[in-house]
Amino acid sequence: MVLIVALVMAQSPKFVHEVTASYQKQTMHGFTVYVSKAARANPADTDPALDLLRDELAEVVALVPAKALATLRTVPVFIENNNPGFPCAAYHPSKDWLKENGYNLDKARSVEISNPKNFVAWVKLNQPLMVLHEMAHAYHDIKFGFSDPYIGAVYKLAQTSGTYDDVGHNRGGTRRHYGLNNQQEFFAEATEAYFGENDFYPFNRAQLRAHDPKAAEMIEWAWGASG
């Protein structure tokens, strides 16, 4: 067993954090997308991910208030080829963290598609607004900071209410709501529910307003949304 693992590791190329100049730059719906050299060398996984990303960004443009798009479009998207640091996608808020972990510092305040194959599979399986979720992290960070007292207070109310401890999931059954993990995830999950469809209950805007009206008000305040 140890020998098999060693052979697999020996045959798997080590992930390389590329410099920005090695990425191919594209524009999708006003968003800047950087595709790594390694990702371009794996079109079987990367091309479907780029097609899906284009659709997901179009959905972001269609769903969020127009005045928020100026902020979102400052957030670049980096496409990698199976970065083992993240299973699918992530938002990078901290240049210090990037430096400590050997990442390209230009990824500060960017969204990274770390694993194109998982990105396509997971979006199609049950996370239709994954890109909006990651962009919500960026918006939260850039506009308010992750220590915003108002967002934090609404999160704390949800956390202590018990109403998110055991909720429906779009794959069936009930689970602890992912938004309970921290203020950032609570904001991103509520954003998905308000503007489209989330994988945890409350799944949509009407349910969010009924289940947690303060969270709905928070989203309307943050994004300048109404209706």
What are these regions (language model features)?
Residues 36, 50-160, 216:
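Acidic/His-rich structured neighborhood in mature extracellular/periplasmic domains
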Residues 3-11:
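Hydrophobic h-region of N-terminal signal peptides that target proteins for export
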Residues 95-121, 125, 153-227:
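Metalloprotease/metallohydrolase-associated module, dominated by Zn2+-dependent proteases
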Residues 23-27, 66-69:
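Short secondary-structure boundary/capping segments within folded domains
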Residues 42-53, 124-132, 144, 177-184, ...:
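Solvent-exposed, acidic/flexible segments
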Residues 43, 146-150, 202:
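Residues in and immediately flanking transmembrane alpha helices
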Residues 11-25:
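Short acidic, Pro/Gly- and aromatic-enriched capping/linker segments at domain boundaries
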Residues 25-47, 115:
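Acidic/histidine-rich, surface-exposed loop or edge segments in extracytoplasmic proteins
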